[in-house]
């Protein structure tokens, strides 16, 4: 467990460092864009003054308005670029979080209690069905089978429960057959669902 924690801390530090670098880069670009906008405004003022002397105030104001419009366009493009960069950063953060979860799981792959907990969480999604068959890879089969009574208590009272070993399945594989289809409780599938949930949460936050 100590080794797992050290690895998790290391990956977490990498993620935090990566996020901080992105934040610094975005802040620098915002400052650069602000300076560029101010420069354009100053140029517009200067050109407006010179044009006012040579061509008259009306023409000068037109030139001034055009340059101000350019400055505003740069500001809008800057804002959009910052939003895009933050969105990319959020996706990278999600990838790092999922990679961390997978790394920790791989180092705990012999932890049968952790796998049992994962399976039980998925069983909660199908506990109202009246016929359930659980298929597990050979490594974890005995662990799941020994907990059959405990699993049965999670289910609908009259539910028929079967637990089977899938000899061809890779380690960490588990799927549940129900009258309404299959539910995949495998580790990789759960990690992908975690990723989808994190991305959905980020998108919802951005929409707000």
From Swiss-Prot:
GO process annotations (BP): bacterial-type flagellum assembly; bacterial-type flagellum-dependent swarming motility; protein transport
GO annotation, cellular component aspect: cytosol
Keywords: Bacterial flagellum biogenesis, Bacterial flagellum protein export, Protein transport, Transport
Database matches in InterPro entries: Flagellar_FliH/T3SS_HrpE, FliH_Bacilli, T3SS_Stator/FliH
Pfam family, one: FliH
Domain of life, per lineage: Bacteria
Protein family (similarity comment): Belongs to the FliH family.
Function of the molecule: Needed for flagellar regrowth and assembly.
Protein name: Probable flagellar assembly protein FliH
Gene for this chain: fliH
């Amino acid at each position: 467990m100590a080794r797992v924690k050290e690895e998790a801390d290391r990956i977490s530090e990498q993620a935090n460092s990566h996020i901080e670098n992105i934040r610094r880069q975005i802040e620098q670009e915002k400052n650069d864009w602000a300076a560029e906008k101010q420069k354009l405004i100053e140029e517009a003022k200067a050109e407006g003054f010179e044009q006012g002397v040579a061509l008259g105030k009306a023409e000068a104001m037109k030139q001034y308005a055009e340059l101000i419009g350019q400055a505003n366009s740069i500001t809008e493009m800057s804002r959009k670029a910052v939003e895009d960069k933050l969105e990319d950063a959020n996706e990278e953060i999600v990838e790092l979080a999922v990679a961390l979860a997978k790394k920790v799981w791989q180092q705990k792959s012999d932890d049968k209690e952790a796998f049992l907990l994962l399976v039980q969480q998925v069983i909660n999604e199908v506990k109202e069905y009246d016929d359930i068959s659980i298929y597990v890879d050979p490594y974890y089969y005995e662990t799941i089978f020994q907990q059959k009574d405990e699993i049965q208590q999670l289910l609908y009272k009259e539910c028929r429960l079967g637990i089977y070993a899938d000899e061809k399945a890779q380690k960490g594989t588990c799927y549940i057959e129900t009258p309404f289809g299959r539910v995949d409780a495998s580790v990789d599938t759960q990690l992908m669902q975690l990723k989808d949930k994190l991305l959905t949460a980020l998108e919802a936050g951005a929409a707000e």
